[in-house]
UniProtKB/Swiss-Prot annotation:
Coiled coil: none annotated. This is Small ribosomal subunit protein uS11. Belongs to the universal ribosomal protein uS11 family. GO terms for biological process: translation. Part of the 30S ribosomal subunit. PANTHER family: 40S RIBOSOMAL PROTEIN S14/30S RIBOSOMAL PROTEIN S11 (PTHR11759).
Amino acid sequence: MADMKWAVAHIKSSFNNTIITVTDITGAETIAKSSGGMVVKAARDESSPYTAMQMAGQLADQLRDKGIHGIHIRVRAPGGNKQRSPGPGAQAAIRAFARAGIRIGRIEDVTPVPHDGTRPKGGRRV
C-alpha cells in the first residue's frame, strides 16, 4: 500500500453551494472539480446533501480512472465574518467518498478564523 497514489479533496461547503476540488498532494495541479450547479439545475438544490453525494460519486469515478485510491480531505466553511460551520453538503460528500471505495486519510477543518478582523454586519444591539 506504500505505492498507493493520494490526492487532496478540498470541500467548500456553505448554505448556498458546495464546491469540491481534488488536487494532487502539493495542491498545485487540479485533478478534478465539481460544484452544485454542475449536478442540479435548481439553485435551491446546490447545497443539498443529495447533490454533494452525486458530486462525490462522480469525482470518485474520475479519481479511480486516474489511478488515485486515497484522499485527504480539507473541509472549509465560509468563515471570516460569516458562518464558521460547514453547510449540509460537507458530511454527505465525505460519506459518499468512503462508500465509493476511496480510502480516506486525514480530515481537517481549514475554515478561515479571523484574529479580531472586520466589524460584523448588522446593527448595534444594546
